[in-house]
């Protein structure tokens, strides 16, 4: 997959299709990043989440892995000059590339796992998990196939349209969602928080490594009412 072709227009394509729903999902659990010192982001895209993270947490160092050179350029423009020393960009394929060493105390994948086939999704999840500190959180925003006949039909229609569009415009090879939640659980992570939008099509989640049953508190959601510039 190569997102260079649609990088400049991606934000507007997103807004046209979903309004602010994806943007809100990215920021739902931003409060979980408050104490993070090392953050790993896969598939950041045009930098909207990165910019908000740097503003919200002014001490964290951030490592970004992104395959699209054009997306990295857009993301770099969103990083203020005074904050550039805190961000390290790596243009690489997350499946085949070698990740920086951990430990990280926060991982972030927003609408990234859905572009991977099951085998590649499992490989990426294991690579990230191996670099997470015990107790670290992983923020995941993704599409899903929800329960309920009407909700499921709605989701499948949207997913079919999206996979078809990205197959044509980016060369995406995946054609359906990988079982990412099962893969995260199999890797030893536990979902401790979630929120759904768009009839269950969109799910923002917080997963924790080595989560104990006594630590299931939910952080307050961070509302967003306008697009990120």
Question: Which residues fall in each region the model found?
Answer:
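C-terminal alpha-helical "lid/dimerization" subdomain adjacent to the S-adenosyl-L-methionine
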Residues: 141-187, 194-195
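A short acidic, Gly/Pro-enriched loop at the edge of an enzyme's catalytic core
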Residues: 97-107
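Conserved alpha-helix/loop element of class I SAM-dependent methyltransferases that forms part
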Residues: 19-36
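A short glycine-rich, Lys/Arg-flanked "PGG" loop and its adjoining helix->strand segment in the class I
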Residues: 122-134
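Core SAM-dependent methyltransferase catalytic element
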Residues: 187-190, 195-229
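Class I SAM-dependent methyltransferase Rossmann-like catalytic core
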Residues: 1-21
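Class I SAM-dependent methyltransferase SAM/SAH-binding core
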Residues: 40-41, 45-96
């Amino acid at each position: 997959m190569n997102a260079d072709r649609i990088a400049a227009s991606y934000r507007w394509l997103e807004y046209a299709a979903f309004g602010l729903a994806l943007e809100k999902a990215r920021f739902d659990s931003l409060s979980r990043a408050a104490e993070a010192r090392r953050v790993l982001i896969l598939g950041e895209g045009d930098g909207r989440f990165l910019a908000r993270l740097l503003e919200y947490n002014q001490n964290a160092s951030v490592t970004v892995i992104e395959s699209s050179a054009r997306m990295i350029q857009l993301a770099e423009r969103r990083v203020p000059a005074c904050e550039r020393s805190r961000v390290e960009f790596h243009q690489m394929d997350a499946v085949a590339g070698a990740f920086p060493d951990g430990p990280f105390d926060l991982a972030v994948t927003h609408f990234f796992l859905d572009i991977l086939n099951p085998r590649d999704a499992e490989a990426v999840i294991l690579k990230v998990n191996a670099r997470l500190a015990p107790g670290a959180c992983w923020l995941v925003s993704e599409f899903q196939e929800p329960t309920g006949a009407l909700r499921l039909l709605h989701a499948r229609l949207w997913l079919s349209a999206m996979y078809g569009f990205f197959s044509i415009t980016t060369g995406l090879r995946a054609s359906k969602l990988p079982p990412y939640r099962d893969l995260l659980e199999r890797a030893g992570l536990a979902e401790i928080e979630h929120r759904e939008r768009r009839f269950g099509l969109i799910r923002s989640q917080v997963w924790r490594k080595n989560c104990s049953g006594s630590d299931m508190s939910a952080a307050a959601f961070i509302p967003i009412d306008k697009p990120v510039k």
